[in-house]
Amino acid sequence: MITAGSKFVTALQGLLSLLTILFISVVVEHRKKGLWLLPATLVYIIGFGLNVAAPGNSVRARSYVGWGYSPLESIGRSFLEGVKHLPEFTGSIVLMVMVMLLPLIWQALKETEYRFRYPGVVLLWSFCLYATGYTPSLYSLGHAGLSRTLNAVKITYLLLLFLNEIYWCGWLQ
């Protein structure tokens, strides 16, 4: 579904990202310009609702009765899965690339006027967004997901890892 992502992992993470951008823009930064995101957010929410309510989902769910966890348990277990997969997703190559990027990031950030005031909040938000990647599979299947799902979660993790590297470097300057 174009308006809400192609599967529940990306749809859920996309929705949370869009809501976060809207919140930061309007509430935190007090910018009325952020309200231009409201129509897109509403379309996304409607699309996500249609995606969740699609008839094929209930048909498919009948094949997996008793496999998944409750919604709250799925959310809690998502954080455990997130911690469990950190070593697998953070290999030596990823760490080497992060170290190699440090001088470039540091230099680029010298020219910005943006103030990086909330590194802890960004780190916490990042982990929560990353963990949401496990929630749909835990809810429907009772495990972290198939390899294609884990690949999508890993990509999210890597993007957020580098976002945090940039943000923390900005905060340290």
Regions of interest found by a model, annotated:
Residues 1-2, 16-23, 98-105, 157-172:
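Transmembrane alpha-helical segments
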Residues 5-16, 23-149:
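Transmembrane catalytic cores of multi-pass membrane glycosyltransferases
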Residues 33, 172-173:
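Intrinsically disordered, polar/acidic, low-complexity terminal segments
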